[in-house]
Amino acid sequence: MKPALTYYALLVLLLASCFSCKTDSEKKKFVIGVSQCTLEGSWRKSMLLDMKVQASEYPGVSLLVEDAADSSLLQVEQIRSLIKRKVDLLIISANESEPVTPIAIEAYRAGIPTILVDRKISSDEYTTCLLYTS
């Protein structure tokens, strides 16, 4: 597994483990919203597969994946929809930084931990950012 993909898989595993210690009566589904700029290309397909595999290890975790198909306008609308669905965590791989910045800030200010992958936004209002450098 490539180093960047290992980080993503570990991230999903770590977040899932945070919510696996509750009793049955306390458990609720932990929903991870994933906003991908595109699902084309082997790297992005591998990343998504790794996320799905890791999430499947935890019955209390589900992934909601959105493919923006290289459209920043579509990505903004999809992220807005994920916010309205009250995801517990939002992972964003922005198509372009500038158009996605306001909606990413909105998610962060709504109390949704917001993780940026592969591309930063034009703000420091996010939880963490994972950038791969060779």
What are these regions (language model features)?
Residues S123-T127:
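A short acidic, helix-capping loop that chelates divalent metal ions and anchors anionic groups
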Residues S17-S20:
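C-terminal motif of bacterial Sec signal peptides marking the signal peptidase cleavage site
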Residues M1-Y8:
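Bacterial N-terminal signal peptides that target proteins for export
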Residues V87-A94, I115-V117:
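Periplasmic-binding protein-like
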Residues G33-Q54, Y58, L63-S81, R85, ...:
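Extracytoplasmic "Venus flytrap"
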Residues K22-V31:
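Bacterial Sec signal peptide processing site at the extreme N-terminus
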Residues Y132-T133:
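Conserved small/polar residues in nucleotide/adenosyl-binding loops
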Residues E98-G111:
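Catalytic-core regions built around general acid/base machinery
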